[in-house]
Amino acid sequence: MMLVFQIALLVLVLYSLLLVVAVPVLYSSASDWSRAKNVILVGSLLWVLMVIGVGVLSFLK
């Protein structure tokens, strides 16, 4: 179970770094704002689900 937690935490950290780069780039691109808005929304919701998942795994370990 500890290995699953560590892998999930690593994925969360890497995904967070990806969002740190991608969100400002999407905000600065003036073209096709509705598509960028949807990508940011889905990416943020996925991040929240990953945080909750890591929290649950941390509680179970």
Curated annotation (Swiss-Prot):
Subcellular location, record wording: Cellular thylakoid membrane
Membrane-topology annotation of the record: Multi-pass membrane protein
GO terms under cellular component: photosystem II reaction center; plasma membrane-derived thylakoid membrane
Transmembrane intervals: 8-28, 41-61
GO biological process: photosynthesis; photosystem II stabilization
UniProt keywords, alphabetically: Membrane, Photosynthesis, Photosystem II, Reaction center, Thylakoid, Transmembrane, Transmembrane helix
InterPro entries: PSII_PsbZ, PSII_PsbZ_sf
Predominant subcellular localization, coarse grouping: membrane
Quaternary organization: PSII is composed of 1 copy each of membrane proteins PsbA, PsbB, PsbC, PsbD, PsbE, PsbF, PsbH, PsbI, PsbJ, PsbK, PsbL, PsbM, PsbT, PsbX, PsbY, PsbZ, Psb30/Ycf12, peripheral proteins PsbO, CyanoQ (PsbQ), PsbU, PsbV and a large number of cofactors. It forms dimeric complexes.
Family to which this protein belongs: Belongs to the PsbZ family.
UniProt function note: May control the interaction of photosystem II (PSII) cores with the light-harvesting antenna, regulates electron flow through the 2 photosystem reaction centers. PSII is a light-driven water plastoquinone oxidoreductase, using light energy to abstract electrons from H(2)O, generating a proton gradient subsequently used for ATP formation.
Name under which the protein is recorded: Photosystem II reaction center protein Z
Lineage: Bacteria, Bacillati, Cyanobacteriota, Cyanophyceae, Synechococcales
